């Protein structure tokens, strides 16, 4: 919902330059994910994953409400949208690894494949339903409602995370963060299956 409303907002603000700014907006939103997700994985190993994910949700909720407020008070500018896209991308870069690594702590190992499948289903279902809801909300209530509803949706996730009681057990390494990053990349490089999956994932993400 957020992305579709944001694209419409960029079209409205940029006018004849909308193609460039649409591309720039997507680039700035995805660049932090490309650059910082590896670091986010190391941070998720070292720190409380639930708190890290909570922080990510708070930031994304704030950017949604921020856009709603800027549009409502008619002070929105294209640079606001670009900046908030980058901030959202940064939050996702650290929240994504925390989310993925939190899941095995919540369920039995035998149920993990089903949990991963269910997580994938809900993610893709949201990608299908989100644009439909965004279009309906835009037509009926306008952009403020789209951003506001998206911001409110984070409250449910935050409430669920606050209700979780997961004991944080740091991964003992004694290594510097840079060394852990190198170790992770070295492991992936020597696992052919992981290399293939990484290339496929990068290509599909990059090409849309």
Where would I find each of the regions flagged by the language model?
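Alpha-helical transmembrane-bundle signature of multi-pass membrane transport and export proteins
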Residues: 1-208
């Amino acid at each position: 919902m957020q992305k579709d409303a944001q694209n419409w907002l960029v079209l409205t603000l940029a006018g004849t330059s909308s193609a460039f700014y649409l591309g720039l907006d997507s680039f700035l939103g995805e660049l932090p994910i490309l650059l910082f997700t590896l670091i986010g994985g190391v941070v998720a190993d070292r720190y409380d994953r639930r708190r890290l994910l909570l922080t990510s949700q708070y930031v994304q909720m704030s950017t949604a409400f921020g856009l709603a407020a800027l549009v409502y008070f008619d002070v929105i500018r294209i640079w606001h949208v670009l900046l908030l896209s980058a901030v959202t991308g940064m939050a996702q870069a650290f929240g994504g690894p925390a989310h993925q690594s939190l899941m095995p702590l919540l369920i039995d190992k035998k149920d993990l494949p089903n949990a991963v499948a269910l997580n994938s289903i809900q993610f893709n279902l949201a990608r299908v339903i989100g644009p439909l809801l965004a279009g309906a909300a835009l037509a009926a209530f306008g952009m403020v409602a789209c951003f506001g509803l998206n911001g409110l949706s984070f409250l449910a996730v935050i409430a669920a995370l606050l209700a979780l009681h997961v004991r944080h057990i740091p991964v003992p390494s004694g290594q510097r963060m840079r060394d852990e990053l190198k170790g992770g990349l070295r492991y992936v490089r020597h696992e052919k299956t992981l290399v293939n999956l990484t290339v496929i994932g990068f290509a599909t993400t990059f090409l849309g």
